């Protein structure tokens, strides 16, 4: 006959302890946030279920403000009793403060200029029909190679705003066709299309692009025309748009300087200060930018 230890028997008879319930109340949070941010009644507020955050004593709650087809997201951190909320971000001092966006920025196979292995990477999401993008493009192309010839690498990402710019996406497709045929010619096209932006319409876009091809080096106009007609590079443009949406971009130009988000047209003086500050920071931090790859060729004599 087996005897169950008395302590074990007593524990077995105790009622199972339930996990303490969160004091979080969605309705109360919505009412509070609507008042806090002066949200108009026409805006729908959708509140996600709480989830663990980087801080053990706080839960993360994502709140979505929906107005028609537009959505704006906010993150709140809620105390376990549901009485205190923090609006903003939680930063880890051991990581780049812009790590979340840096992890989403994919630059492989994107048009680029500047020094490979540069300590500062600038990624710009742009629209060929956007007037502000035209101004920012001019700022970047004229100033960066002179001021930071070895320190900045620029990557271009398509983000055409189709709802308001009817020829922006076809132009993006054309740009990717050119990049696919001759990567160096992409930047000629980039500069040309912004310079001639006011002359282009949805009806004359193809003819204008083919005119450009006649003056560009190492471009086959017939091949370019076929690529545009078949929309052979539309998937590349769509992938760039999807990346922009994942980053919650809703305006152009939007730039990321080593992950730091800059929205709108930045005057050169302001942008230069940001880049200079980032260069100084990276001297010690070394948590962003590119690391130039070394090509090591095996030496058979070492075997």
List where the protein language model places each region:
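Structural alpha/beta surface segment adjacent to cysteine/selenocysteine redox centers
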Residues: 123-214, 247-250, 277, 282-302
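C-terminal cap of thioredoxin/glutaredoxin-like
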Residues: 19-87, 210-303
């Amino acid at each position: 006959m087996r005897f169950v230890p008395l302590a074990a028997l007593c524990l077995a008879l105790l009622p199972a302890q339930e996990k303490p319930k969160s004091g979080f109340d969605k309705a109360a949070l919505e009412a509070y946030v609507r008042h806090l941010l002066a949200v108009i009644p026409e805006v729908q507020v959708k509140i996600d279920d709480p989830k663990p955050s980087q801080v053990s004593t706080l839960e993360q709650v994502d709140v979505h403000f929906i107005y028609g087809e537009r959505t704006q997201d906010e993150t709140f951190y809620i105390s376990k009793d549901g009485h205190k909320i923090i609006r903003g971000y939680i930063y880890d001092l051991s990581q780049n403060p812009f790590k979340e966006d840096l992890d989403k920025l994919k630059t492989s196979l994107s048009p680029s200029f500047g020094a490979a292995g540069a300590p500062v990477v600038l990624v710009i999401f742009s629209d060929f029909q956007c007037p502000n993008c035209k101004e920012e493009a001019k700022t970047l192309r004229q100033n960066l190679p002179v001021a930071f010839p070895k320190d900045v690498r620029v990557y271009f990402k398509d983000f055409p705003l189709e709802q308001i710019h009817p020829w922006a996406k076809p132009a993006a497709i054309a740009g990717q066709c050119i990049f696919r045929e001759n990567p160096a010619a992409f930047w000629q096209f980039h500069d040309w299309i912004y310079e001639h932006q006011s002359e282009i319409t949805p009806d004359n876009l193809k003819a204008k692009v083919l005119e450009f091809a006649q003056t560009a080096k190492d471009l086959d106009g017939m091949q370019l025309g076929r690529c545009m007609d078949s929309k052979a590079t539309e998937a590349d443009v769509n992938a760039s748009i999807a990346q922009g949406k994942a980053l919650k971009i809703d305006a152009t130009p939007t730039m990321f300087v080593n992950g730091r988000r800059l929205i709108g047209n930045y005057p050169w003086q302001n942008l230069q200060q940001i880049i200079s500050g980032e260069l100084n920071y990276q001297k010690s931090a070394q948590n962003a930018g590119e690391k130039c790859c070394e090509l090591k060729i095996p030496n058979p004599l070492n075997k």
